[in-house]
A protein has these predicted regions:
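Hydrophobic, membrane-inserted alpha-helices
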Residues: 5-6, 44-47, 162-167, 183-190, ...
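Multi-pass, polyprenyl lipid-linked donor-dependent membrane glycosyltransferases
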Residues: 1-31, 41, 50-61, 199-206
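Membrane-lumen/periplasm interface segments of specific transmembrane helices
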Residues: 50-51, 58-182
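Signature aromatic-anchored transmembrane alpha helix within multi-pass, membrane-resident enzymes
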Residues: 100-104, 218-226
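Membrane-helix interface segments
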Residues: 34-43, 151-155, 174-180, 219-224
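Transmembrane alpha-helix segments characteristic
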Residues: 170-192, 201, 205, 225
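Transmembrane-helix signature of polytopic, lipid-linked glycan biosynthesis machinery
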Residues: 7-12, 110-114, 182-197, 211
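Transmembrane alpha-helices and membrane-interface helical segments
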Residues: 26-33, 64-72, 167, 206-223
């Protein structure tokens, strides 16, 4: 699925996608392996730290980690009534607090590198001004233009986004809560500027491939695709 996808060319370019996706795979694998095993949280936290060092969006992995800790503590049930007791539980377990803080630590290494190379530790944010005006317009206009000019290359962006959302809804039904949380936040990020990189964010988050694999693997006629 990864190498046959339309955006697999990112994996062959001089980008960090390949390393980033590998770290995400490691993160979620150990996050779900032997649920509640605190040693696996260490591996996931280390993978998240390296991911945040590789790409800034890796910082978001801290949220799936916290959510999975919550789910493991309360046997997969999400209730706001347990939120207070969960916070108390976290403060009583400094090891878990350390694991949570370890996740975004890589961004500081990234910022130090940027400061050394460019003299601007916030270069990853400030450089976005170069891509703000991508001409794609708001998502509503893009969807409208897509149906009026289906052959325009940029108008496939909303279609890819809609298909990704469908996959995420399916994953929610299958109780992939941590994965979907990461995917949704990653999906929101491009809206802070232009949406030119929307497809790259969707493919690079790796989560959509987990959902597609789960779906195809459950279908006898399509099992070979999974």
């Amino acid at each position: 699925l990864v190498y046959m996808g339309p955006y697999s060319f990112y994996l062959h370019c001089v980008y960090s996608e390949t390393l980033f996706m590998m770290l995400i795979a490691v993160f979620f694998y150990y996050l779900k392996k032997e649920k509640g095993n605190i040693n696996n949280y260490w591996i996931s936290a280390a993978a998240a730290m390296l991911a945040s060092c590789t790409r800034i969006v890796g910082v978001i992995l801290v949220f799936p980690l916290v959510l999975q800790m919550y789910l493991d503590l309360y046997e997969g049930r999400i209730t706001f009534g347990k939120l207070g007791s969960f916070i108390v539980h976290m403060f009583k377990n400094p090891v878990k607090i350390l694991q949570v803080f370890l996740c975004p630590a890589g961004i500081f290494v990234n910022m130090m590198h940027l400061y050394y190379v460019t003299g601007d530790a916030w270069a990853f944010r400030n450089v976005q001004a170069a891509w703000r005006e991508d001409g794609a317009g708001w998502i509503g206009n893009m969807i409208w233009d897509f149906f009026n000019n289906i052959y325009a290359e940029r108008y496939w962006i909303p279609l890819v986004m809609i298909l990704a959302i469908i996959v995420y809804v399916y994953m929610l039904k299958c109780r992939y809560y941590s994965e979907v949380l990461f995917a949704v936040i990653t999906l929101i990020i491009p809206f802070t500027g232009g949406v030119m990189s929307m497809c790259r964010f969707i493919a690079g988050s790796y989560v959509v491939y987990i959902g597609l694999y789960d779906y195809f693997a459950d279908k006898k006629d399509l099992k070979w695709l999974g």
